[in-house]
Amino acid sequence: MARSGLRSARQVVLALVILALLAGIALGIWSLRPTPSYSSEDLTAGSPFDVTFRVENKNPWFPLANLRISCVLAHVRASGIPPTLIGANNMRFAAGNGLGLEPGEFATFTCPFRTLIGHPINEDPAVAQRAEIYFRGEYDIPLLGSLRMSDNSVPFFLNTRVLPPRWTIKP
């Protein structure tokens, strides 16, 4: 009787070890996936909503194939503007490949937020300082081109403490 109990305990431990090993392998494969990295260029003149943003594929092995970027105006404090998703404009790929980013490549794009907020922004110039934005990238999963993956960036806010002001990652 004691041997069968010991054998059952051994089988349970073996099953748990196998499950932990499979979970570790799945986590390792998941961590190798490419994810887009976003940044903004300096705001030199004009509206903060006319800034050019940059997306980069920092993954050394896999491309971001068929990349589509959407800009999300998450919220503007003290306003009635609802969260809104808009497709990015003026996507310019560095290598001339209009379909995606190879490892180490980057592209630039703009977000048409002014169409949401309206013209002129001069009616409330602080609206950009109260805004929070993020980006949503959609691309093909490497090695499984028929499946798509989406990835949300961290939130950005207009940082006026740096000169010139720019959209930076929210602390």
Predicted regions span which residues?
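Hydrophobic membrane-insertion alpha-helices, especially the h-region
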Residues: 11-29
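Low-complexity, acidic Ser/Thr/Pro/Gly-rich terminal tails and inter-domain linkers that flank the onset
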Residues: 25-51, 163-169
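Short beta-strand elements of extracellular/lumenal beta-sandwich folds
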Residues: 46-62
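Intrinsically disordered, low-complexity Pro/Gly/Ser/Thr-rich segments with frequent PxxP/GP/PP motifs
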Residues: 79-121
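Short glycine/proline/serine/threonine-rich loop/turn segments at secondary-structure transition edges
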Residues: 117-132
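Enriched for extracellular/lumenal, surface-exposed ectodomains of secreted and cell-surface proteins
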Residues: 132-145
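Acidic, serine/threonine- and proline-rich intrinsically disordered appendage/tail regions
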Residues: 142-171
